[in-house]
């Protein structure tokens, strides 16, 4: 949709509107097929560094602002984190229930899992965007913390002993929040 609206390739838009303003010098999207002429792989195709991605998380955490510069509008951030599935049927065992032992139907925003929800407002206070290969970026607005856990998993994310980096990563954000709570 962005390519059609702006009449530009996705990578060009990403670089101009997100990467360069955030100083993400080592970030780009890989194409689905590297033979040339293929669209970028938006799900799991970002090649980046921890330094670059933390700049992106910092901007999201600060409501679209990075180093006193508005990169994304606050309304855009709000829409990204809003419930995008409404009253859709959420089957037992979906990511939020399986990974966090929480159940709610508003599990997905735009490119973000709505992991933890304020029951009074319906607003997500913890969002994430985990990858099957072990990447787990998260933001917890209630505990005022965000981070990025990276583990490279070869082959299937699900191991013989039942461990899955995709489903296991949220333990890290919960542990960080618990430690912060003890320090306050």
Give the positions of each predicted feature.
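Alpha-helical scaffold elements that line and support the substrate/ligand-binding pocket
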Residues: 1-18, 52-63, 143-148
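Second-shell loop/turn segments in exported
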Residues: 1-4, 41-44, 66-67
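Short, well-structured active-site flanking segments
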Residues: 5-30, 69-74
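Extracytoplasmic/secreted envelope proteins and their assembly/folding machinery
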Residues: 11, 15, 50, 54-57, ...
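Active-site Gly/Thr loop motif
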Residues: 25-51, 82-146
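A penicillin-recognizing enzyme superfamily signal
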Residues: 70-74, 78-79, 90
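Short, gly/Ser/Thr-rich active-site loops of penicillin-recognizing serine hydrolases
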Residues: 85-95, 117, 156-184
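Short, well-ordered beta-strand elements
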Residues: 144-157, 161
């Amino acid at each position: 949709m962005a390519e059609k609206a702006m009449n530009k390739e996705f990578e060009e838009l990403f670089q101009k509107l997100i990467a360069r303003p955030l100083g993400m010098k080592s970030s780009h999207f890989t194409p689905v097929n590297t033979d040339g002429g293929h669209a970028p792989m938006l799900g799991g195709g970002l090649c980046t560094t921890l330094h670059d991605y933390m700049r992106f998380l910092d901007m999201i955490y600060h409501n679209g602002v990075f180093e006193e510069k508005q990169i994304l509008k606050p309304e855009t951030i709000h829409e990204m984190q809003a419930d995008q599935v409404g009253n859709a049927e959420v089957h037992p065992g979906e990511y939020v229930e399986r990974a966090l032992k929480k159940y709610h139907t508003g599990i997905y925003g735009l490119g973000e899992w709505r992991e933890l929800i304020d029951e009074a407002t319906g607003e997500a206070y913890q969002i994430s965007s985990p990858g099957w290969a072990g990447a787990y970026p998260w933001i917890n607005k209630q505990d005022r913390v965000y981070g990025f856990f990276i583990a490279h998993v070869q082959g299937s994310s699900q191991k013989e002993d039942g461990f899955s980096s995709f489903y296991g990563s949220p333990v890290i954000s919960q542990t960080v929040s618990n430690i912060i709570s003890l320090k306050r």
